[in-house]
Amino acid sequence: MPQLNPNPWLFIMLMSWLTFSLIIQPKLLPFTPINPPSNKTPTTTKTSPWTWPWT
């Protein structure tokens, strides 16, 4: 069963995770959101019920 042979796939998986962890992830971490979350209380809107013409 060739899919159980870890020879090429284990190396590819480890190299891809190593690439992600060491190269791509540090470049993505310095990005911060432009608008940080605030502590505003949510406002509730008053809605009026809809009257259906056939009821």
Curated annotation (Swiss-Prot):
The keyword 4Fe-4S does not apply. It holds the Pfam family ATP-synt_8. Residues 35-55 are annotated as: Disordered. InterPro entries: ATP8_metazoa, ATPase_protein_8. GO terms for molecular function: proton transmembrane transporter activity. It is found in: Mitochondrion membrane. Keywords: ATP synthesis, CF(0), Hydrogen ion transport, Ion transport, Membrane, Mitochondrion, Transmembrane, Transmembrane helix, Transport. The keyword Cytoplasm does not apply. Belongs to the ATPase protein 8 family. F-type ATPases have 2 components, CF(1) - the catalytic core - and CF(0) - the membrane proton channel. This is ATP synthase protein 8. It comes from Corythaeola cristata (Great blue turaco).
